[in-house]
A protein has these predicted regions:
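Hydrolases whose catalytic domains are alpha/beta-hydrolase-1, hotdog thioesterase
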Residues: 54-58
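A conserved short beta-strand
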Residues: 64-76
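Short beta-strand immediately N-terminal to the catalytic nucleophile in serine-hydrolase-like folds
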Residues: 45-47, 72, 96
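Short, proline-enriched alpha-helix->beta-strand connector loops that line the catalytic pocket
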Residues: 5-9, 87-93
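Gly/Ser-rich "nucleophile elbow"/oxyanion-hole loop immediately N-terminal to the catalytic nucleophile
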Residues: 19-50, 60-63
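C-terminal catalytic histidine-bearing segment of alpha/beta-hydrolase fold enzymes
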Residues: 94-96, 100-162
Length: 162
């Protein structure tokens, strides 16, 4: 519930056998938007680890098609080209990472957020860096009880639409 209005989510969790590109994710988005009753102004992309990287990569090419992204310990190298597309489309971003992640460096998240904010993205790109070891930032990020500014990640997403 956001603003006293209730919403329902359709959650699609594709499992790719190889590293997915933004184009691979777009095939999934297009398939489900053509088959299910989905509000095209409220498509949100999130993922963890490789999926978090896919969220960054998708947004770096198709930012105009989605309402917000929430990458979690996203494994994607920061590029100015992708950051420009995200910033130019004013795509809301809330990224999560553990500072002691031993699989995907927190520098991926820091790089994107710092670059986006240096481009004066509106709204300002947000990140939550947990003081924690290991790769699992998703248990906390996706928890209904973890909130910042009185919003969990789902409530945060729902405040945005295209």
């Amino acid at each position: 519930t956001v603003g006293e209005k209730s919403f329902s989510f359709i959650v699609v969790s594709p499992q790719f056998k190889t590293w997915p590109s933004g184009d691979d994710v777009d095939v999934v988005v297009n398939y489900f938007t053509s088959k299910l009753r989905i509000d095209p102004t409220r498509i949100y992309i999130t993922g963890l680890s490789m999926g978090g990287g896919a969220a960054w990569d998708y947004a770096g090419k198709y930012a105009s098609k989605i309402a917000a992204i929430a990458p979690v310990c996203g494994a994607s190298s920061t590029t100015e080209a992708k950051a420009k597309i995200i910033a130019n489309n004013k795509l809301p971003v809330w990224a999560f990472h553990n500072d002691g992640d031993d699989r995907v460096s927190v520098n991926h998240t820091l790089g994107y957020i710092n670059m986006l904010n240096s481009m004066n993205i509106t709204p300002k790109a947000k990140m939550t860096i947990y003081a924690a070891a290991g790769h699992d930032a998703w248990s906390k990020a996706y928890s209904l009880t973890y909130k910042e500014n009185d919003m969990n990640v789902y409530e945060w997403m729902l405040q945005y639409h295209r």
